[in-house]
């Protein structure tokens, strides 16, 4: 049985499917951990969720975390379902980071028209997962407070943190959220003494920069790192 941790997919279903089926060759004995941001930027947000839902329905061991882009979507959906004269601020913020491609993938023009099953799926996403040697989270944890696991906002939105190992039982943080170069991902994986985190997001949608534009998969048991280049954009 293998464990695979996969960060921000951002609406790239062909890339995800090729990574899982052709490179990882997943089986129902494996465990898959997704770090959030399934939607936006790429053209197939709905298709990404459909594919993951299909894996879940077919008995694969799938664990899904919430990302800030799902939070954008949920907040926009809730705001759009309330009476208003002007477009809600959160909806404008979401549009600035790729809402248009997600709405188009659902065949709708407004957040409130996204089908309820997808909204329910996003609402049910976890904020973090604890493994023996790692804590998985979309963005990071707030170590400035006594209990970093109480701050769910930081889990999907923070952009910087310094791990307090006394609050993680000595475990490193594995996260996505902020795109980093492939060489940096490889560096932090193999230098636990120098880095208290492993950043896995290679910016799958950043296809115009060297060292970027891959969807990553990381095996925390043997430090294997697999990259699939973008096939959707």
What are these regions (language model features)?
Residues 5, 32-34, 64-65, 135, ...:
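Residue-level marker for buried hydrophobic side chains located in beta-strands
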Residues 25-28, 58, 129-131:
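Glycine-rich phosphate-binding loop signature in dinucleotide/nucleotide-binding domains
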Residues 10-11, 40, 71, 141, ...:
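Short, glycine/acidic-enriched loop or turn micro-motifs at the edges of active sites
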């Amino acid at each position: 049985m293998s464990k695979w941790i996969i960060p921000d997919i951002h609406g790239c279903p062909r890339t995800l499917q090729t990574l899982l089926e052709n490179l990882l060759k997943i089986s129902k004995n494996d465990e898959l951990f997704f770090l959030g941001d399934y939607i936006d930027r790429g053209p197939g947000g709905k298709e990404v969720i459909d594919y993951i839902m299909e894996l879940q329905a077919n008995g694969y061991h799938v664990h899904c975390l919430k990302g800030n882009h799902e939070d954008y979507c949920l907040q926009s959906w809730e705001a759009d379902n309330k009476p208003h004269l002007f477009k809600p601020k959160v909806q404008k913020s979401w549009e600035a980071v790729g809402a248009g491609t997600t709405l188009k993938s659902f065949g709708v023009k407004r957040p409130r028209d996204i089908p309820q099953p997808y909204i329910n799926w996003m609402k049910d996403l976890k904020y973090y997962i604890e493994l023996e040697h790692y804590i998985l989270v979309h963005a990071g944890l707030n170590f400035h407070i006594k209990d970093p696991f109480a701050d769910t906002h930081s889990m999907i939105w923070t952009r910087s943190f310094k791990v307090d190992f006394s609050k993680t039982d000595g475990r490193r943080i594995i996260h996505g959220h902020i795109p980093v170069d492939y060489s940096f991902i490889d560096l932090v994986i193999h230098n636990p003494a120098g880095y208290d985190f492993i950043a896995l997001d290679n910016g799958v949608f950043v296809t115009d920069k060297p060292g970027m534009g891959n969807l990553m998969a990381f095996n925390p048991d043997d430090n294997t790192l697999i990259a699939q280049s973008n096939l959707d954009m």
